[in-house]
């Protein structure tokens, strides 16, 4: 019973994109590991830019510094 948790920043990932991610990950686990899609769980969490850190700062600040 595979469980995959995908975390992305909350920047407008569409319902269609989420569906594609879920299907793609499920298919990959079936193809590579022989896992049953009926018992494969995929969860997508959207994280606010201020709640995701990189380089010691949140993503908003990190991007400001990069530009």
Language model features by range: what are they?
Residues 2-67:
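A domain-level signal for the structural core that forms small-molecule/cofactor-binding pockets
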């Amino acid at each position: 019973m595979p469980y995959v948790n995908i975390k992305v920043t909350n920047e407008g990932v569409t319902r269609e994109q989420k569906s594609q991610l879920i299907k793609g990950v499920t298919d990959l686990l079936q193809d590579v590991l022989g896992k049953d899609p009926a018992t494969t769980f995929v969860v997508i969490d959207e994280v606010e830019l201020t709640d995701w850190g990189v380089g010691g700062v949140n993503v908003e600040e990190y991007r400001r510094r990069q530009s």
